[in-house]
Amino acid sequence: MRYLKKVTIYISLLILTIFIGGCGFINKEDSKETEIKQNFNKMLNVYPTKNLEDFYDKEGFRDEEFDKGDKGTWIIRSEMTKQPKGKIMTSRGMVLYINRNTRTAKGYFLIDEIKDDNSGRPIENEKKYPVKMNHNKIFPTKPISDDKLKKEIENFKFFVQYGDFKNLKDYKDGEISYNPNVPSYSAQYQLNNNDNNVKQLRKRYDIPTNQAPKLLLKGDGDLKGSSVGSKNLEFTFVENKEENIFFTDAVQFTPSEDDES
């Protein structure tokens, strides 16, 4: 009887230890997810900024990488990539460098096509069309004979102008990844088609699928904050060997260069 009692106590303690250890692991995962969200909030709090000229007066994260007197440059990028079944992969998007020192903004609209050659090796064909921004409007800086393309450029809106992440804290059950050696980190969430950001993307782009996307928050660099490294958003609607549909976006605050574009 005494032996059975000892065995029962031992088993109970073992179960309790496993339970506590499991809770510790869960808490550790939750803690890392919270830390990643807090890190991304430093970038996502600029969403939405409807008037791009507001970036001239927005201060970003600064560290020793910035020269004294350098007000910094915002780099914003939005790009939609599609690869229908049996067709080539095409990306269309824009990059804009908003220099707070000179209060000027320039960049380029890009069209990137990737297809396989006869040997199955990918061939990339990228075209860039230089642009500038004045009074919150985008203008090509060189003549464009294609009126449809010219209109697409002039009507382009960056995701930061209409995206909104005030409910980021409500995103739950993310797939968390963290590698302190790189360092790199990410959090991925399954969204639904009622999500406001998903609705906004569908409103502006022809997205030929009813599948709700996954949102990936992906970054590298010091998780506690650094101007070195990058942070990216990716909405993946379809991803397989035959078909791909995804939207990528990034907003970075960096030391200014003499000629960013």
Curated annotation (Swiss-Prot):
Q: What is this protein called?
A: Uncharacterized lipoprotein SERP2422
Lipid anchor positions (N-palmitoyl cysteine) = 23
Report the superkingdom from the record. Bacteria
Tell me which UniProt keywords the record has, alphabetically.
Cell membrane, Lipoprotein, Membrane, Palmitate, Signal
Compartments (UniProt record): Cell membrane
Matching Pfam families, A to Z? DUF576 (PF04507)
For this record, the Gene Ontology CC terms, alphabetical, are:
plasma membrane
Its family?
Answer: Belongs to the staphylococcal tandem lipoprotein family.
Signal peptide (from-to): 1-22
Identify the main location: membrane
Matching PROSITE patterns, A to Z? PROKAR_LIPOPROTEIN (PS51257)
> What topology does the record note for this protein and the membrane?
Lipid-anchor
Q: Where is the lipid attached (S-diacylglycerol cysteine)?
A: 23
